[in-house]
Amino acid sequence: MKAFDYSLVKDPQYFCDNRMEAHSDHVYYRDGNEMQTAVQDGTETSFRYSLNGLWKFHYARNYKSAVQGFEKEDYCCYDWDDIHVPAHIQMEGYDAPQYANVQYPWEGHEEIYPGQIPERFNPVASYVKYFTVPEHMKGKRLFISFQGAESGLALWLNGAFVGYSEDSFTPSEFELTDYLKDGQNKLAAQVFKWTSSSWCEDQDFFRFSGIYRDVYLYTVPDTHAYDLQIRAIPEENLDVADLEIKVKTWGKGSIAFRLEKDGECVLEEKKSLTEAGNEEADAEAFYIQKTNSSKTVQNSFVWKINNPKLWSAEDPQLYDLTIELYDEAGNIQEVIPQKVGFRRFEMKNGIMTLNGKRIVFKGVNRHEFSSVSGRHVSEEELRKDLRIMKQNNINAIRTCHYPDASLIYQLCDEFGIYMIDETNLESHGSWDTAEFTKDYTYVVPHDKPEWQSMMLDRANSMY
């Protein structure tokens, strides 16, 4: 059985282990009735099971002080403290929020070289959640999604090491199927405040740590779309648009599309996945360090849409796209609702244009932040932010300086707000030190090959 090696946390090349690769964040439902109920009542898809709530918790100032072996099945954690998930530990009474701009948060406390991590003070948050697999999920492949954990996450299930992930601002997902048992399961996680990747998370903001976004279990049907790419781009005359959909699927069967505008059907078509597939790849493309899984098929579809109503911040016209997947027997497997906006972005003579007209950005840099809960922002607070922006003629947001939780992207489509999504990659503290000392080997990531894979992974994870 593979074991977790904490010494690797200071290696820039160790940023994921057995973690699923990035994929689109679309929600899928069992059938149309479940989808309609969810849209009307705000209920969750039955393919997901939330683990939000109280978890057992232990805080340590550093790894040496953390409880060793707590992840084992026979280690009892019931007398530990309770902590809310999602939440920053600093907003729950452990450690303290720290604001820093260019300086790294450990400067003046411990001298370390880029890539290394503090040892005397580097808080470790140990979490435990006991759960039983819901009846309707039994017998299915089971996955877990941590939508945000800052900044390094190690995971165990029933004493077995599942995997590891860094990047504080994009999801970390793992398959749990091979580690499950009947009855109660023990899920254990350790979150490290600083890892080698923290050298590239030197943003101008408050420094927190912990599991601060949603956590949920999920299953997939036998025929499943795990990744979607939708491009809706008008031709230059804007009278006709190309609707291109790329979908990567597991399993065989068929796929159906229906595009509507204001209740009127614009497009309806059904295709065989086996006939439409134009690229077959081993599931290693979907996993990191995981083999023995089924094949995946990528399908591409393109349609011409006449006289499209165009999306802009001033007039955010959206179409309703419904995608249905069926197995080979014709049984519906999942239904995926998506909002689609047709718009044409171009650079003309050095000027950015949308739908043939010059864009005038009246925008703001927006941190994902609540005065009450830090970077765990409620839907109510987020909607309030966006309403105030629109009321004050703000039409653009830059997510400084990292990807936000998924909801804001959907809401910007609906509200009519241009979105500039920033990668979680900032290391200006190393530049200042190098400028002062004239030791430019201190700069990261620079041209150092050991940082390359981590950088590319962060760009690829920005779904």
Feature map (PLM): residue ranges:
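Surface beta-strand/loop "capping" patches
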Residues: 222-251
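Mature N-terminal segment immediately following signal peptide/propeptide cleavage
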Residues: 47-58
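Active-site-adjacent substrate/metal-binding segments within catalytic domains
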Residues: 90-133, 137-145, 150-157, 163-166, ...
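Extended acidic/polar, glycine-enriched regions
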Residues: 178-184, 246-348
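Short Gly/aromatic-enriched secondary-structure transition segments
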Residues: 66-85
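Accessory beta-strand-rich segments of carbohydrate-active enzymes
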Residues: 2-20, 25, 41-42, 56-62, ...
